[in-house]
Amino acid sequence: MPGMEAENSNASRAEELKQLANEAFKGHKYSQAIDLYTQAIELNGENAVYYANRAFAHTKLEEYGSAIQDGTRAIEIDPRYSKGYYRRGAAYLAMGKFKDALKDFQQVKKLCPNDPDATKKLKECEKAVMKLKFEEAISVPESQRRSVADSIDYRSVGSGPGSSYVPTKTTAVSAAAALMGVLVVYMGTKAATMVAAAASAALLVVLITFLWGRCSDGFFTKSRTLELEVEPQYAGARIEGDVVTLDFVKKMLDDFKNQKNLHKRYAYQIVLQTREMLRALPSLVDIVVPEGKHFTVCGDVHGQFYDLLNIFELNGLPSEDNPYLFNGDFVDRGSFSLEVILTLFAFKCMCPSAIHLARGNHESKSMNKIYGFEGEVRSKLSEIFVELFAEVFCCLPLAHVINEKVFVVHGGLFSVDGVKLSDIRAIDRFCEPPEEGLMCELLWSDPQPQPGRGPSKRGVGLSFGGDVTKRFLQENNLDLVVRSHEVKDEGYEIEHDGKLITVFSAPNYCDQMGNKGAFIRFEAPDMKPNIVTFSAVPHPDVKPMAYANNFLRMFS
C-alpha cells in the first residue's frame, strides 16, 4: 500500500507540473514549459500526453529532432493516441520531410476520421508531397544546370534569357507523369469526377506533345524579355551607373520603411554585384581590425527589417570605419526578408569592407521553400529572382576569423576532433548544404551544457560540449567562438566557461517569443566582447510567415 500511495502521489504531482507547463506554454515560455513537462515525465514516464505536449514546445523552439523523439515515445506508449502522430508529423513537416509527415497524418485521419482539422492538414500534406514529386520529376542535374546569374545583363535593358535550364524530353514526360499523379490524388475515383479527370488527361497529352517538340526546336533557349526598363513614373531609389552610393542606400531604406519596392533593375544590379564579390572570397574569411578600431557582430535577423534599422540607429550605419559581420539567417520567418537581404547586399556593394556576410542554415533552397523567403521573393519581385538568390546564397562564406582570435560561425563545431581552419578553408561551399559533414555542422550544430557530443535537438548536425569547444580553440590558437542560430531570452548567452557566445539579433522573434536582440562590439587590439542588447520596435501589420507555405502556417 505505501508503494501505491507513493505512485498516486507522483501521478498527482505530475499532473500539477503538466498544468504549470501548460501555463508557461501559453505565455510563450517554451523552455520553461519543456523543463516542467520533463519533471512531470520523471514522475510518470508512461503518460503519452506529457510527451506530446513537450513535443509541441520543442517544435516552437525549432527543436524538431527532439519533437520527433517525443512524438515517437508518445506513440510507443499509446499507439492509438492521435496527438503523438500529429506532433511528430508537424515536426517532420517543419524539417521538409513531407513523405514521413504524410504517413503520420494519414494515421491521424485513420484514428480521427470525422475530425475536420485532421482532414484539412492531411490534404495540405498531400499537396506538399505531390508538389515535391513534381519538382523531383522536372529537376535538372547539377551538371546540366545553367547559371541564371550568368544569363542576366542588367545593363542591357529589355534583353536577356529568363530561364536557367533547358528541359529535356525525359523531363517533359516525367513532368507530365508527375502531374498525372497529382490528378489521381485529387480527382479520386468517384464518377462525378471522371469527366474532369478525362479532360485533364487530354490536356496532359497536349502538354507532352508540346514539350516534346519544344525541347528540340530551341523554344526554351530563346530569350524572354526581362523587365529592366525603369519607367518614367518610378519615384524610388536609383543607381546612377555602376556605383552604389550611400545616398542611394539611404533613399532605398526610406522607401523600404514606407513599404515601397525597389525597381527590379536595381535589385538585379545589387544582387549580381554582390555575387561577384562573394564568389571571390574563401570559405573561411580572415578579418583584420586595426588597433584602436572596433568591429560589430550581429546574429540572426530573420526578415525583421525594422529591427535591422534599429540596430543601425543604435550602432551606426555600416561603413569602412564602422564594419559589421552578419552571421547568417538573414531571411525567412519575418515577412520583410527581401528588404533585409537587399539592404545588406547594397551596403556590401557600397563598401565591401563595411559589411561581411556569413551563410546560415536558412540561406538554402529547402528552408526558403518552407519558411517564406521564396514566396516573398516571388510576390515582390519574380520567379527568376528565386533562382538568383539561391545561387548567390551558395557563394556566401561559411565562417570568419577576426584578428586571429575570434572564430565566428552560424551554427557550431564538429562531430570529430582535429578540424583545423585550413580544413574549413578547403570546403567547396558552392552548393546546397549537405545533410552531414563539416559544412552541415558549421551551419546547424548547437552547444550543450554537458561535455562530449550528443544528437542534435534539431535533427540535423549535432550538439557539442565545452570540452569540444576548448580543444578546437586550443588546436587553432583561438580565444573565442561566436555563433548564432538559437533564440536567447536576453539576445545572447555565454557558455562553455566563457569560450562560446551565442548572439541573436531578432528581438521578439516571430512576434511571439518576447526575447531581446543583441549584437557584439569588439575593440582592437584586445578583442574583448562588449554585448549590447535591445528590444523589438514596431513594424507594419504584416504577420511573420505571411509568405510561408500554407501547411506550415497551420502549425505556427
From Swiss-Prot:
The active site is at H362. Mn(2+) 1 binds at D300, H302, D329. It is an enzyme of class 3 (hydrolase). GO terms for molecular function: metal ion binding; protein serine/threonine phosphatase activity. Mn(2+) 2 binds at D329, N361, H410, H485. Expressed in roots, stems, leaves, flowers, and fruits. Binds 2 manganese ions per subunit. The chain crosses the membrane at residues 171-191, 192-212. GO terms for cellular component: cytosol; endoplasmic reticulum membrane; nuclear membrane; nuclear speck; nucleus. Its cofactor is Mn(2+). Keywords: Cytoplasm, Endoplasmic reticulum, Hydrolase, Manganese, Membrane, Metal-binding, Nucleus, Protein phosphatase, Repeat, TPR repeat, Transmembrane, Transmembrane helix. It catalyses: O-phospho-L-seryl-[protein] + H2O = L-seryl-[protein] + phosphate; O-phospho-L-threonyl-[protein] + H2O = L-threonyl-[protein] + phosphate. Its EC number is 3.1.3.16. It holds the Pfam family PPP5. The keyword 4Fe-4S does not apply. PROSITE patterns: TPR, TPR_REGION. TPR repeats lie at residues 14-47, 49-81, 82-115. The keyword Cytoplasm applies. Activated by linoleic acid, linolenic acid, oleic acid, and arachidonic acid (AA). PANTHER family: SERINE/THREONINE-PROTEIN PHOSPHATASE 5-RELATED, SERINE_THREONINE-PROTEIN PHOSPHATASE 5. Belongs to the PPP phosphatase family. PP-5 (PP-T) subfamily. Interacts with PHYA and PHYB, mostly when they are phosphorylated and in Pfr forms. TPR repeats are required for the binding with phytochromes. Isoform 2 dephosphorylates phosphorylated phytochromes, with a preference toward Pfr forms, and enhances phytochrome-mediated photoresponses. Can use para-nitrophenylphosphate (pNPP) and phosphorylated casein as substrate at pH 7.5 and 5.0. This is Serine/threonine-protein phosphatase 5. It comes from Solanum lycopersicum (Tomato). The gene is PP5.
